[in-house]
């Protein structure tokens, strides 16, 4: 819903929407020129070739001739679809089609790239390629990425995260801020006996070759180690994950990118 409102496909019930300081109602034409959008469902024309889809899209922004060829070559190389240019979109796999969707959205060098669950259902290799390319363009073209996702490892890479549950904002902040508020730290310790771990009187779980201890924060972890130096010859401290944040905020878990 949020993305459809931002793109002008749905009318908001109330309030005002500003994108890059521009009012959505007053400056829609400008905003549309500055946005690149990858919807959850592909908007490519299945009857046309990859080349024709991208050529027609580029023409809407006045990108023709050598400018079109140069941008096409750049995107085809980075997103690895040069061999697909003559293929009909309807014959592409899901991962191939998603790469073309992203190329379509990036063609006019948008200031803001909107991604609506762009990697759902994709294999790990394609997901990694897509994020490598997007991260590269974000830096080289000074582009903002607005992402909706159920994959918390993707949210962990964001500069700012908003968790929405049942249509309302439940929590927001940087990944580090959210982890500090909603999760603790973990100490993974190796080469010790369970009786020594029990003597610490803190929550723990047995893992392969060691134990994982739960502590409120990094300060508590440091104090525990200082008090018991004889136990901590081989250990590591890690923060909770964004999955832990999501569970703490919403009471729900995410399995395979979907709520459960």
Model-derived features with residue positions:
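Conserved ABC ATPase signature
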Residues: 88-92
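Conserved ABC ATPase "signature" region
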Residues: 55, 59, 66-84
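Catalytic Walker B motif of ABC-type/P-loop ATPase nucleotide-binding domains
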Residues: 113-116
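Short, charged/small-residue-rich alpha-helical element at the C-terminal edge
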Residues: 183-253
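Conserved ABC transporter NBD signature motif
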Residues: 15-23, 31
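Conserved catalytic motifs of ABC-family nucleotide-binding domains
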Residues: 109
